[in-house]
Amino acid sequence: MSLTKEIQQAICKAEIKKGNHVAENFNYFFPGELDVISVAKSGYVSELEVKVSRSDFNADAKKRKWHFYNWALQYPLSQSCQTPNYFTYVCPVINGKAIISESELKPYMGLIYFQDGELITVRKPKLIHKHKHDIIRLLTKMITVNNWHHYYGAQKLTIQNREAIAANDEYLKEKVNNSIKHLPRL
């Protein structure tokens, strides 16, 4: 099992113990893919982003999702907010050194270290906005995405796209074969 997957599973177990609903690699409703999404009974959503290398952490700063977080901070009462309520980085401690330090974080970000199979909270995240998300809608989507991944190995649109491409390829082969049949022989 990869280190990322090991950390994701540890996060999910900890969040489930708190009574929250979780999903890994969730990419609906929010910008980008969330390594772990945790939905509390309150309707507040947490994004837990796993980083296992410095280059991964540095690349994260360039992602488009930060525009959405900045917007949520600027307009915290917006009902159309498409960002989680909390954000936390989770990284391993390797040879006694953490990949991310607290001083590198924005004020609202939380930080958790993963060391020797344990999660250690370094800093709790601050509430980004007070918009409560529709739990039924989120959980329905989480279950649907999980089912498609579990039973089909991909998301519904990916499967539908593959089927459409296969049907298109078959159609094109038939057209080419029919065209070749009608060519004059030399």
Over which residues does each language-model region extend?
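Non-catalytic C-terminal interaction segments of nucleic acid-processing enzymes
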Residues: 13, 99-186
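Active-site beta-strand-loop-beta-strand hairpin of nuclease catalytic cores
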Residues: 34-47, 51-53
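Flexible, charged surface loops at secondary-structure boundaries
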Residues: 15-17, 39-42, 79-83, 105
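Catalytic cores of nucleic-acid endonucleases
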Residues: 51-109
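Short, well-structured alpha-helical interface segments that form or flank functional binding sites
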Residues: 6, 31-34, 79-82, 86
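Acidic-basic catalytic patches of nuclease active cores, encompassing PD-(D/E)XK
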Residues: 1-32, 39-41
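Short, flexible, glycine/charge-rich loop motifs used to bind or transfer phosphoryl groups or to couple energy/partner
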Residues: 11, 26-27, 36-38, 75-80, ...
